[in-house]
Amino acid sequence: MAVAMRAQCAKVQAARPARATTVVCRASAQSRRELLGLGVLLGAAALAPAANAGVVEDLLAKSAANKALNNKKRLATSYANLARSRTVYDGTCQFPENFFGCEELAFNKGVKYIAEDLKIECEGKDAKSCGSKFTLRSK
């Protein structure tokens, strides 16, 4: 918001000619509104709460603490993705057994990398928040 000072100035003649003329300037209604808006904006900025740097520090500490677990999960997922791409070729996910999908078969029969990935995914979380607990039938 650009604040432009607009004023109306008028020369006022003194009653006696010995006095100098004075200039009286009055702000227009528009500039008063702009100044009032600027004042409200500055007041709101002063009353706004400061950013909490403690939250960022807590998140960084939590991330550093979970780094080893996250690296382990990332490696297991990489191996599991390779195993998923080879399940049909290797014969670990064949037709009669894969009716509910290869993930279900891997969880129940223990396909090497996929089953390990599913177990590691829920490590460090409570049972309710784990996204890998999708199975239709469990052991």
From Swiss-Prot:
One of its GO terms (cellular component) is chloroplast photosystem I. Keywords: Chloroplast, Membrane, Photosynthesis, Photosystem I, Plastid, Thylakoid, Transit peptide. The keyword Glycoprotein does not apply. It is a peripheral membrane protein. Belongs to the psaN family. It comes from Volvox carteri. GO terms for biological process: photosynthesis. The lineage of its organism: Eukaryota, Viridiplantae, Chlorophyta, core chlorophytes, Chlorophyceae. It is found in: Plastid, Chloroplast thylakoid membrane. May function in mediating the binding of the antenna complexes to the PSI reaction center and core antenna. This is Photosystem I reaction center subunit N, chloroplastic. Residues 1-53 form a transit peptide.
